[in-house]
Amino acid sequence: MRILRVPTDFRVVEQFDEAMLSRQGEHLVYSVSSRGLNTAESAARLADAAGVPMDSVSYAGQKPKEGVAGQVFSVHGGEPISMRGFEFVARRIGVADRPVQASDITGNAYEIVVRDLQGDDMRRLRHNMAQVRDGGLPSYFDDQR
């Protein structure tokens, strides 16, 4: 069995509570999809594009460089932006009167591709996935924790 053979074999997307969005605010809120970039690198791209210092960019959680990540950022001040490229897409989803923070994320959705299953792998995988479904799984990846 092989996991994470190619970058798109791992996807994680933050589940965002849109209740923090407001009708007015100084913080522009973006949905960002990145590939091959960690959270700090994505934040730097947003800061550069908006013309603001890095400390004007906030995010709820750390995402790894490996794989494809979907996460929410807020930018205090600066120019509204929209970016679309192979490894980075930023789309404004609203405004807020405060920066995005960890409590704005209700969880993460994962997609992990498993390749080259052999023998008893599928039976074990189904058994283990049932345990994950029933009990959850802590998220320990890269330098997050």
Which positions does each model-derived feature cover?
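Ser/Thr-Pro-rich, acidic low-complexity intrinsically disordered regions of eukaryotic RNA-binding
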Residues: T39-R45
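Extended, charged/glycine-rich binding lobes that contact polyanionic ligands
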Residues: M1-R23, H27, R35-L37, A49-A50, ...
